[in-house]
A protein has these predicted regions:
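Catalytic beta-strand/loop cores that center a nucleophilic Ser/Cys/Thr
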Residues: 119-122, 129, 225, 236, ...
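Extracellular ligand-binding/catalytic regions of CAZymes and related secreted enzymes
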Residues: 17-23, 29-60, 237, 335-416
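Sec-dependent N-terminal signal peptides
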Residues: 2-16
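A glycine-rich, often tryptophan-bearing local segment used as a flexible ligand/cofactor-contacting loop or short
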Residues: 167-303
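Hydrophobic targeting/anchoring helices
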Residues: 17-122, 371, 378, 413
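Helical hinge/lid and interdomain linker segments adjacent to catalytic or ligand-binding clefts
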Residues: 19-20, 25-29, 64-69, 118-224, ...
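Alpha-helical scaffolding within the catalytic cores
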Residues: 92-97, 141-143, 351-355
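Extracellular/periplasmic catalytic domains that process cell-envelope and extracellular macromolecules
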Residues: 102-105, 146-149, 210, 337, ...
């Protein structure tokens, strides 16, 4: 639960501290760097007030010269607040479907990414770099050594936890593919695994354990469904012989345990290495043509009670309700295969596609967002990274940055 400060408590300090409002509605000149300003304030040990559903999820920050200078340098719009204006804002928060959440810590952020250069971008590292938010890069060695527990928040992107090398078999003669294959095989042997798929499944289990003990997991694209598949099919060899030299275990492939997965169930696998798809989870499927154009592809963010459901409300803060869709190896999720406890944050109201989901695992949480890059509708292998200065008000990238601030929220003491 999130600690919600009442109006009476708030008035104890608003009279003595100058504050600025960073609006997050259509008036904002740079939404993405605004998150960086909020994060920077937390790094200076200054609390940030996140106004859920007020002008697109605006921030109130204590005014000092460094924050003001940062806003000016980053072209982030801010408004100086008077006591009267603050009073009006807090009164509105109390009366409307709005809420105030205190952000009071700087989340330690890790991005799971291989050491070798991959021929595609990562939307989260692009967002973090553009917003000037610090993060560390971790990979399999750090996971095996227990280093994940140094971090509050972990991101997974275009990764494959099934040991099928991203199902990029068509690129098997490319140098980057050969390097990936060689690196993964060496690392698996280093930890006494005879196949990459057994090793990668173990990595998925360790990440799940990290989340269940209180970690925050945010994943996009193929890292979402391949992660869940690795957990559910942990004891089944479904990797084609071209990957590990052994045939698919067709006898035991039905011995799936969907209880081990965190988000999906009752789906079927695609084991053919020439099909660029893991399972029937993905919707629409990557290997089947779609007639939808980029102009007509969008998903709708769900509406929640800010006072009763502050967590999902935080995750959907935006200046728009309908967000442009974007494709990926895993573009979205077939609603048919969602577990009952999974909360839908965004979906296509006219099809079976769910785009954005959230759930709990033990003491931690996970959030999955389908698609590869919110501002590159069809991101292909070898395409250059997206230039975010051309998309500084991107609604899709805002969803990523909402997840960055989510772990900073102050916890509410449990009632006795």
């Amino acid at each position: 639960m999130i600690k919600i400060l009442t109006i009476s408590i708030l008035f104890n300090f608003i009279f003595t501290i100058n504050k600025i409002l960073i609006p997050m509605d259509d008036s904002q000149t740079n939404h993405l760097k605004a998150y960086g300003v909020a994060f920077s304030s937390l790094e200076k040990q200054n609390k940030v007030e996140w106004l859920l559903n007020y002008r697109g999820g605006s921030f109130i920050i204590n005014l000092d010269n460094s924050i003001k200078r940062e806003c000016l340098l980053k072209n982030v719009l801010f408004e100086t607040l008077s006591i009267e204006k603050i009073s009006v804002i807090y009164s509105m928060l109390e009366q409307e479907n709005m809420e105030l959440v205190i952000l009071d810590k700087t989340p330690k952020i890790a991005v799971y990414s291989p050491p070798n250069q991959q021929p595609w971008d990562d939307a989260v590292t692009l967002a973090l770099t553009y917003a000037e938010i610090k993060y560390d890069v971790v990979f399999d060695d750090e996971v095996m050594n227990g280093d994940l527990y140094k971090y509050d928040w972990l991101h997974l992107h275009h990764e494959d936890f099934t040991g099928q090398y991203g199902k990029f078999y068509r690129y098997r003669n490319q140098n980057w593919y050969k390097e990936m294959e060689n690196t993964f095989t060496k690392t698996a042997k280093k930890y006494n695994f005879d196949t990459v798929h057994k090793f990668k499944k173990t990595i998925a289990v360790k990440i799940r354990d990290y989340v269940s003990k209180g970690g925050f997991l945010f994943a996009m694209c193929s890292a979402t469904d391949s992660f869940d598949i690795a957990l559910s099919f942990y004891n089944v060899d479904f990797a084609h012989s071209i990957y590990d030299g052994t045939p698919i275990d067709k006898i035991n492939i039905s011995n799936v345990d969907f209880e081990n997965g965190i988000a999906f169930e009752n789906y079927e696998l695609y084991t053919d290495p020439t099909i660029y798809e893991y399972s029937t989870i993905d919707y629409p499927s990557s290997h089947q043509p779609t007639t939808r154009s980029a102009e007509s592809d969008y998903f709708t963010l769900s509406n929640f009670s800010a006072k009763w459901d502050p967590v999902p409300t935080m995750l959907v803060q935006n200046h728009v309700t309908n967000v442009n869709g974007f494709m990926g190896q895993t573009t979205g999720y077939n609603k048919e295969f969602l577990k009952s406890h999974v909360l839908i944050l965004g979906e296509d109201l006219y099809s079976s596609q769910v785009k954005y989901i959230h759930g709990n695992i033990g003491k931690g949480t996970f959030t999955f967002l389908g698609g590869h890059d919110p501002e590159d509708y069809r991101h292909f292998v070898g395409d250059p990274p997206t230039e975010l200065d051309l998309h500084r008000n991107s609604p899709g990238y805002r969803l990523i940055l909402n997840n960055i601030l989510f772990p900073a929220a102050k916890k509410k003491p449990k009632k006795t």
